[in-house]
Amino acid sequence: MKILDKNKNLLAEVIRSEDIIHEKNFYTEEKEEFQFASFNLKENTVIKRHIHNKQERVIKSTSEVIVVIEGTIEVEIYDLDENLEHKCILNKGDTVALFSGGHGLKAIGNSKFIEVKQGPYNPETDKKLF
């Protein structure tokens, strides 16, 4: 589920575990700063060994991915003007990719999740609390 602001800019994308039905599904275009995909591989499927070549890239903002391992998390998604655009509940196996705007998380009971984002990360300058 794509979450857009009032100007149709992509803020986030929520992927439910049960919705991962295609062998490979890229949710972002190749030109985007952050690539986001899901895979549903059959037994013995092989992704060929590979190395990602080093190359300079221009990254203008930090994208973040949250994967819920256990429990339930409420995610609030805000536009660039800090207006709440969407709230959603993520359960075990669900994922949200946060591309633009702001966000907040709340654990609904004990929860575990993995967070992935680009680095380097400077806690002094990388984010603004609101």
Question: Where do the language-model regions lie?
Answer:
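A short, N-terminal "cap"/entry segment at the start of jelly-roll beta-barrel domains
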Residues: 1-39
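Conserved short histidine dyad/triad with adjacent acidic residue
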Residues: 39-60
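Glycine- and acidic-residue-biased ligand/ion/polar-headgroup-sensing regions
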Residues: 43, 61-78
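Short beta-strand His + acidic residue motifs that chelate non-heme Fe in jelly-roll/DSBH
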Residues: 49, 75-76, 96-98, 102-108, ...
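Short acidic-glycine-tyrosine-enriched beta hairpin
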Residues: 79-100
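Double-stranded beta-helix
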Residues: 106-130
